[in-house]
Amino acid sequence: METVVIVAIGVLATIFLASFAALVVVCRQRYCRPRDLLQCYDSKPIVDLIGAMETQSEPSELELDDVVITNPHIEAILENEDWIEDASGLMSHCIAILKICHTLTEKLVAMTMGSGAKMKTSASLSDIIVVAKRISPRVDDVVKSMYPPLDPKLLDARTTALLLSVSHLVLVTRNACHLTGGLDWIDQSLTAAEEHLEVLREAALASEPDKGLPGPEGFLQEQSAI
């Protein structure tokens, strides 16, 4: 059963990597101007991102407690205005949330692999598998919602669903593996994701039509109707 849960969560981590790669392709095809397509294809930021993802997919010989898959090129790529034309400013927050969720998943994989003997019951392992399977569709939904035209309300809803699924995975992993102290990084990661999510929520609210009091013209029309 321990092997099953390790494989299941390992597959989930692989799906995150594939989602990032798909996101690069989507952004390149959908956001780059046609006349700059060849230049975008050969641009260094994209090459660096794809290269980093391929390097990270290789098996690591590090200790399980040190297993972390992060992308140090993300910040530099987002600052490059020629890489993506995102006038809304929401794309970077979506990528940040995906990155945080991916990092959390990788570390949870390490903790699960290193806590096999501490597992409570086979039911606990089953819970981890069930929750983990719910995350990959959420990742796909977030990536699909990043296709233009961007809908802030859709981005808000789908990133919220993804973060809730990852938070649920954190809870069941903590319970199954008897994780207690030294886990401040989990709460810090979730807090950071919430900060990015708050930006998406504000954008979603701003995209809704005003429901305030009617202006002078509307007031005069109402009086005429009366």
Swiss-Prot record:
Membrane topology qualifier: Single-pass type II membrane protein
Extracellular side: 25-226
GO CC entries: endoplasmic reticulum; endoplasmic reticulum membrane; extracellular exosome; extracellular space; plasma membrane
Subcellular location: Endoplasmic reticulum membrane; Cell membrane; Secreted; Secreted, Extracellular exosome
InterPro entries documented for this protein: TMEM98
Region (Disordered): 207-226
Principal subcellular localization: endoplasmic reticulum
Superkingdom to which the source organism belongs: Eukaryota
Entry keywords, A to Z: Cell membrane, Endoplasmic reticulum, Membrane, Secreted, Transmembrane, Transmembrane helix
Cytoplasmic-facing ranges: 1-3
Region ranges (Required for interaction with MYRF): 1-88
UniProt key word Endoplasmic reticulum: yes
A GO BP annotation: negative regulation of protein localization to nucleus
Transmembrane segments: 4-24
Family the UniProt entry places it in: Belongs to the TMEM98 family.
Role summary: Functions as a negative regulator of MYRF in oligodendrocyte differentiation and myelination. Interacts with the C-terminal of MYRF inhibiting MYRF self-cleavage and N-fragment nuclear translocation. The secreted form promotes differentiation of T helper 1 cells (Th1).
Subunit and partners: Interacts (via N-terminal region) with MYRF; the interaction inhibits MYRF self-cleavage.
Name of the molecule in the record: Transmembrane protein 98
